């Protein structure tokens, strides 16, 4: 489908706007995946606050210029599906990783987080980031354990002091 100049400019502006507000981006190749499966992926992405687009590589290169996702330019080869996470940095990576397990034809090319290029083989780094709630829960459990440990050490010191006296 041929796009006129205004359509191309609109696509570049839209993708650029989404990229500027995103926390991370993941690039994949969806050749060989059925339309039904892709529809399921898009639905899951919408529910997780992830924007998914299939955009021509030249337009995508222009859209990410001047953003932290410029490092992904080399990954824009062949059919490109790009996902921007706007609510949680690991959301798109987690969804794509799970989808790739179930659909071997789906290939994750690369990802970017805070201007750092992450190859598709290392997608676990981004996919395993804890959500905000998980991070708070981990912090609270660590703080509780530290307080309990301090109490135990204090009681043990008191016991030792009384035994010595």
From Swiss-Prot:
Query: Which stretch is the leader sequence?
Result: none
Instruction: Report the InterPro entries cross-referenced here.
Output: Ribosomal_uL10, Ribosomal_uL10-like_sf, Ribosomal_uL10_bac, Ribosomal_uL10_bac_type, Ribosomal_uL10_CS_bac
Does the UniProt entry include the keyword Ribosomal protein?
yes
Spell out the GO cellular component terms annotated for this protein, sorted alphabetically and separated by semicolons. large ribosomal subunit
Sorted alphabetically, the Gene Ontology BP terms of this entry are: translation
Keyword Ribonucleoprotein among UniProt keywords: yes
Alphabetized, the UniProt keywords read:
Ribonucleoprotein, Ribosomal protein, RNA-binding, rRNA-binding
- Source superkingdom: Bacteria
Drop me one GO molecular function for this one: structural constituent of ribosome
What does the protein in this record do?
A: Forms part of the ribosomal stalk, playing a central role in the interaction of the ribosome with GTP-bound translation factors.
- Give the family this protein belongs to, as stated in its UniProt record: Belongs to the universal ribosomal protein uL10 family.
Q: How does it assemble?
A: Part of the ribosomal stalk of the 50S ribosomal subunit. The N-terminus interacts with L11 and the large rRNA to form the base of the stalk. The C-terminus forms an elongated spine to which L12 dimers bind in a sequential fashion forming a multimeric L10(L12)X complex.
Official protein name in the record: Large ribosomal subunit protein uL10
Species, as recorded? Proteus mirabilis (strain HI4320)
Q: What is the lineage of its organism?
A: Bacteria, Pseudomonadati, Pseudomonadota, Gammaproteobacteria, Enterobacterales
